[in-house]
């Protein structure tokens, strides 16, 4: 019997369950419908109240933010309300599906609780719209059963606080800064800088600039400068740093204007005084260039506006002139001058000079040997000898102390060179094209180099030997004084030479050669292609001249230098 009774009870329970299921479904549907209607009515109220949005945009910086839905457009608010309703209804549906043995009373109680929670939530939001002071409490204490709304309200509140704090912090600065920055950046002047430490560093630099000294004109100047640069369209967003310290814009402007302005400083090149006035270390490389660029960027426009000490065209001309002076070679007499000691030192060091004197070897005369052992003295010792033929006896005959070189030639060359340099400088400064300047400069340099070589050769010729030894009989000084050596130049590569010995004049042309310069005088006619040629003497002796190596009673006419 007992098994039969148990089966009957199970069948009755199964028959009751289909009747309970429709009741639970009806209760859930009613509950959802009520929630949707309430949410729709609330969203409709938000749409019909545009004054709330305008109040949010125009509220003062110190006021408390409104509710989270007051900061979003109406369509977004409706979407958020429906999403929250769906999120709140899903957990309750899951809980309701698990109830099998509860009756209609439990379902009704659950529905009443949810409607009360929803009505309480809507009531709190309505009060928040009417009185903004209740908004923080509603954000911190949300309605039960609605945790997502509480989290979002907290996040929105912190965002609003972060947006409001920069406006409060910048309220102590001049009004132009806040207003103009808001106009340019769309109301978010310092929000990007406030995210990191960069904004704090910039604000500290501005504060330090105001507090560098107690000069009462400093604050007035800086305020005026910042306002001027802001109106000009080039605001000063950061303070320049030089030598790991803030560049004092006020003192820099004061020092430069006291000296006459930026153009005057560039022309006079007195940046060292400015550096000392700013208490900058003297070891800074390119301090003048750095100060000039910073002044042009931050202060030159202000100088032109307030004091009009110069114009941008004058500034550009001063910069170009300074650049030309830095690159222009220094044309001076020392560049083309011949100094035997300097030439000897340069040759010993092995460093090629730009306009070094031509290297002509005189191994026999003692001006220099191939080994370079006798280059210390440019003059020839009295013991220097000339060779006659091969192994013939040698005697000494003195010659006048100086060569017959015109003195006026050097002065004429110096005057010509000075005039050429002045003409070249005028052409360079006249604004010709760069190609013409370069070609003209190269031509002038070549011409000056040739003149320098010629003048150096004359200087070297003046230091030629004091005595010449001639094979033959020895004369005393009275007779030797009659001998003369004339030296003239026909071109840069040859020298006309004439020697008068015992009434006989020997003339010839000397050509420059690297190893040794030879002078050979004989009966052969003058030859231009040979290393040295000679012309016949103007007053020949009765006896014919002998060839090389042939002894004769007359003085030998075969010479070798």
From Swiss-Prot:
Per the record, which residues fall in region Disordered? 1-36, 53-122, 136-179, 370-397, 523-561
Q: Would you say which domain of life the source belongs to?
A: Eukaryota
**Record's compositionally biased regions (Acidic residues):** 90-109
- Keyword terms, alphabetized: Acetylation, DNA-binding, Methylation, Nucleus, Phosphoprotein, Transcription, Transcription regulation, Tumor suppressor
Subcellular location per the Swiss-Prot or TrEMBL entry:
Nucleus
| Chain's role | Transcription factor which may be involved in neuroblastoma growth and malignant transformation. Favors nuclear targeting of ARID3A.
From the Swiss-Prot or TrEMBL record, give the protein name. Answer: AT-rich interactive domain-containing protein 3B
Instruction: Write down the species.
Output: Homo sapiens
